């Protein structure tokens, strides 16, 4: 059910009616297009395939098997019902001790056992969305700003800004060096903010990167840590994709750098955001973590955690699961293998029709380069192409402009939130759209021919303030149904 009218918006707060910081972006519009016409192999085979959802569904069978073997871990079983009354009562808002210990051990495991984490510094939140907002509330005041390398996760504009009132200042990264962040670019963004009298409180890094699927190397992390320390600003590292690395180089956590640089840096300025949504494929469990090396931040975040607690039943179940070292080791190994296999299958399918992706080693998505399909090298052309992909090809992929990418023609496409059959259907649709001429057993991509077809079309879009494309067949408002980004808030 959707709500079409907003007759009483004038009696609401500015926060409630501020569309600038909500979900008015092609990223969320793609979700709504999927909500209106979701693909189903039998019920709706011509519907929109959801490739805008960074969800890891490749290892559900492993978790299901563990639950079958450990029925006592859930109060929803005959064996576990005896724990119902104790779990149903109020618990310590700081979290069950066994849960925080299990989380700390799991964080160590996902970082190769190269660092240790203190359970007393583990603060719960309602998913990484809640964890990110919590850390911003702890570090900044309304009007303050954080630097963030672009392209970056689109919902940061909602999650980090909407209620906190902070600003995000993009640090432009481009394809000339495979979108790698440089200290020079960080310095320029910082100095420009200073000239504009904007108070910069910190730098936010997503490592591994969403949407690039790449990891930051040790030297880069050291340089960025040095920069933030020199300017006495915070370094917030969003590491929610830590265990999605499926190829070299390995993931390096900022915690490792701190161990190397203990005598040279101020740990009080460093904070980690983590969750189980990506690494375990459990976004519905809403487990987010703030881990700070600053005592005052830990204390403040704990007080704020009452606004977004993790249910005791969830803590109880996960404490048991994550304490099973044999299961965790097998899960992480198998997850990496399956992600590598799916990534290779998908990118090979794209390469067969001449579509390249940024070389990546982590994440649940690819950074797809569709620049050869643009009518012109403009963001208007990017949006026109996106509109056709949504409405005609029936794939929800996310345009680079929604990630604040500085170059038109890049798209994030997710590959781990569907079964093998759906992936192949998506690839078939892409193959049909791009067009392939077959000569014997060889396939010859004809991207340039498709580009010429685009030039014949008068498909242009002028950005509105909302970046909203009216030609996408959507209702003005969509209900927060289970597929909606209003529900799946951390993608």
UniProtKB/Swiss-Prot annotation:
Pathway noted in the entry: Alkene biosynthesis; ethylene biosynthesis via S-adenosyl-L-methionine; ethylene from S-adenosyl-L-methionine: step 1/2
Cofactor dependence: pyridoxal 5'-phosphate
Biological process terms in GO annotation: amino acid metabolic process; ethylene biosynthetic process; fruit ripening
Enzyme class: lyase
PANTHER family referenced in this protein's UniProt entry, alphabetically: 1-AMINOCYCLOPROPANE-1-CARBOXYLATE SYNTHASE-LIKE PROTEIN 1 (PTHR43795:SF74), BIFUNCTIONAL ASPARTATE AMINOTRANSFERASE AND GLUTAMATE/ASPARTATE-PREPHENATE AMINOTRANSFERASE-RELATED (PTHR43795)
Subunit structure: Homodimer.
Protein's name according to its UniProt entry: 1-aminocyclopropane-1-carboxylate synthase
Taxonomic source organism: Nicotiana tabacum
Primary gene name: ACS1
């Amino acid at each position: 059910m959707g709500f079409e009218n907003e007759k009483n918006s004038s009696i609401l707060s500015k926060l409630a009616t501020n569309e600038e910081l909500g979900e008015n972006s092609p990223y969320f519009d793609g979700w709504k297009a999927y909500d209106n016409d979701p693909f189903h192999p039998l019920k709706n085979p011509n519907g929109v395939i959801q490739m805008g959802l960074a969800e890891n569904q490749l290892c559900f069978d492993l978790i299901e098997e563990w639950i079958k073997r450990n029925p006592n871990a859930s109060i929803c079983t005959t064996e576990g019902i005896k724990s119902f009354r104790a779990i149903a009562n109020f618990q310590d808002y700081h979290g069950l001790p066994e849960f925080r210990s299990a989380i700390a051990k799991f964080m160590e495991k996902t970082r190769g056992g190269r660092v240790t984490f203190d359970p007393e510094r583990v603060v719960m939140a309602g998913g990484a969305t809640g964890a990110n907002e919590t850390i911003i509330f702890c570090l900044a005041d309304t009007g303050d700003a954080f630097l963030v390398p672009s392209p970056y996760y689109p919902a940061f504009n909602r999650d980090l800004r909407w209620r906190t009132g902070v600003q995000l200042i993009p640090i432009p990264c481009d394809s000339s060096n495979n979108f790698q962040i440089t200290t020079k670019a960080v310095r320029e963004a910082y100095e420009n903010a200073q000239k504009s009298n904007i108070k910069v409180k910190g730098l936010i890094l997503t490592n591994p990167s969403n949407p690039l699927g790449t990891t930051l190397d040790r030297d880069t992390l050291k340089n960025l840590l040095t920069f933030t320390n020199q300017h006495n600003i915070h370094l917030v590292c969003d590491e929610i994709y830590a265990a999605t690395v499926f190829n070299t180089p390995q993931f390096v956590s900022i915690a490792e750098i701190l161990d190397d640089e203990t005598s040279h840096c101020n740990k009080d300025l460093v904070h980690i955001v983590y969750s189980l949504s990506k690494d375990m494929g459990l976004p519905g469990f809403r487990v987010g973590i703030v881990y700070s090396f600053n005592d005052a931040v830990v204390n403040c975040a704990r007080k704020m955690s009452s606004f977004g607690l993790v249910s005791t039943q969830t803590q109880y179940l996960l404490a048991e699961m994550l304490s099973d070292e044999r299961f965790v080791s097998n899960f992480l190994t198998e997850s990496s293998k399956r992600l590598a296999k799916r990534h290779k299958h998908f990118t090979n399918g794209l390469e067969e029709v001449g579509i390249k992706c940024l070389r990546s080693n982590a994440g649940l998505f690819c950074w797809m380069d569709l620049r050869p399909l643009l009518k012109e090298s403009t963001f208007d052309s990017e949006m026109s192409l996106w509109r056709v992909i949504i409405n005609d090809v029936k794939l929800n992929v996310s345009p680079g402009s929604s990630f604040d990418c500085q170059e038109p023609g890049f798209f994030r496409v997710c590959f781990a939130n569907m079964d093998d059959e759906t992936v192949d259907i998506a690839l078939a649709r892409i193959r049909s759209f791009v067009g392939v001429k077959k000569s014997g057993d060889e396939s010859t991509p004809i991207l340039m021919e498709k580009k010429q077809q685009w030039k014949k079309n008068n498909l242009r879009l002028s950005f509105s303030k909302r970046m909203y494309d009216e030609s996408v067949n959507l209702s003005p408002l969509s209900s927060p149904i289970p597929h909606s980004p209003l529900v799946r808030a951390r993608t």
